[in-house]
Amino acid sequence: EMCIRDRGYSGVRPKLATLLLKMINKGILPIIPRQGSVGASGDLAPLSHIGCALIGEGTVYFQDRIMPSMKALKEANLKPIELEAKEGLSLINGTQVSTAIGVKALYKACKLLRTADIISALSVEASLSTRAVFKPAIHRLKKHKGQTVSAKNIYSILKQSMIVQSHENCDKIQDPYCMRCIPHIHGASWDMFANSEKIINNEINSVSDNPLIFRNEEVLSSGHFHAEPVAQALDALSIAISEIGAISERRIHHFMKGADDRLPCFGAIDG
């Protein structure tokens, strides 16, 4: 919300943005239902709950309590605003909620991707697989940044592994796909994450209001309220993260079914 108002194309008074900023600083957070957005015509329904809070209507979260907006404003020594022309529309006609959901998804995805290489390195070690397939020289032949980084991460993690080092001279030709193809899958997911992150960041710093008010007092309508870039970025991110889960499941299956005497079913030596 603040990024959009700061650009100056919404045709709203500075006091509206000021009140919103004061509410954020004092910890007054409008209660927005989990469901209700349409995205294709702006996040009308969820954003309306932010607008309601500014005029003293609806409910908010303040000081660890859910309460009426008017009560929270009074306790924080703030006054609700009386909306003027264009301000009501400006508050609800944008992609802010979709984008906020995207930011949260990116944060969680980043944590998952960062831990995925570490977890998979442990799987490589536990399965008595080789470290050699993660050598940077191999992966530099593929022009995918994510793959190169993932392979380098795993190769570095396993550097001091006595278990992996003891496997260097064994007679096994190749390890299962779920081990030696980790950088290819993790890397592809990292690249997709990076692209989604770029799109979401672009949306954060864009103007998604409609109509737009320009400095020469020209009023122009467009479709900036449409959240298609955000939607496609998050669809792609969902696919990327699901692939991390898929290869993880294959590694679990590998351990459960067993491979030989050194890697028995369920990892249980006796039973």
Regions found by a protein language model. Give the residues of each.
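FAD-binding glycine-rich core of flavoenzymes that anchor FAD
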Residues: 9-35
